[in-house]
Amino acid sequence: MARKHPKRSDPRILVLDIGGTHVKLLVTGLKQAIKIPSGPALTPKAMVQQVNQALTDRPYVVVSIGYPGPVVHGHPVREPFNLGSGWVGFNFRKAFSRPVKIVNDAAMQALGGYERGKLLFLGLGTGLGSAMIVDGILEPMELAHLPYKNGKTYEDYIGLRGLERLGRRKWEREVGKVVAQLRAALEPEQVVLGGGNAKKLKKLPPGTMRGNNQNAFKGGFRLWSEDKRESQRFRY
């Protein structure tokens, strides 16, 4: 089982899970995550300011960020669809005055819930996050904006826009169809459905399990693990 919190020897870690409606943050030792609003006007500079205001009495020494978009070599390479601009090229290390590790948000959730084998993670939130871990190698994916049907993307059907347009029942059927399609193509041993809208599924598609949203924080802690056995399990 993955441990819930870093060991005492680990640094005090701040984990940020950036979503389309909220940024959720947790510092080593805190039992409850803090939420700050996000949305189309949120810039990285504003986020850093709000995070530090929320943590005036909670010191931290390193930062993990789950970013809602593609990340290459620890840097965002595309502006997020559901937030403000300025994320690509932003110097997070300088802004926080601390070491920072950035991964895709779905990848961070997948990392937090992974045990072994081949896992596919789909994050059903404002958008659609996706990641795979194959024998400890983390592979973020960008399935959201691939064509699905009727001139629309996967995200148009099973992201928040799809839920609002189709209604819960039809949306749930589309989730099942997408999962079946991806299972056939990628042959994962496990399929985990996470994100804020996963809880709206009345019946899970066959062969899937509902993820725990706390896995994002576990994944963020794992990025800085000082346990060599833990840190050597993953490549990202």
Task: Identify what each model region corresponds to.
Residues 143-180, 187, 209-219, 224-232, ...:
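Helical "lid/coupling" subdomains associated with nucleotide-phosphate turnover
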Residues 39-52, 56-64, 69-118, 157-158, ...:
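Glycine-rich phosphate-binding loop and adjoining helix at the ATP-binding site
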Residues 13-17, 62-64, 119-123, 192:
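Short glycine-aspartate micro-motif
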Residues 23, 90, 94-109, 118, ...:
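Glycine-rich phosphate-binding loop plus the immediately following alpha-helix
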Residues 67, 124-126, 195-196:
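Short secondary-structure boundary segments
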Residues 22, 182-213:
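Glycine-rich phosphate-binding loops at beta-strand->alpha-helix junctions
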Residues 2-49, 53, 57, 137-165:
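Short glycine-rich, Thr/Ser-proximal phosphate-binding strand/loop in the N-terminal lobe
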Residues 23-27, 69, 111, 128-133:
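Short beta-strand scaffold segments in enzyme catalytic cores
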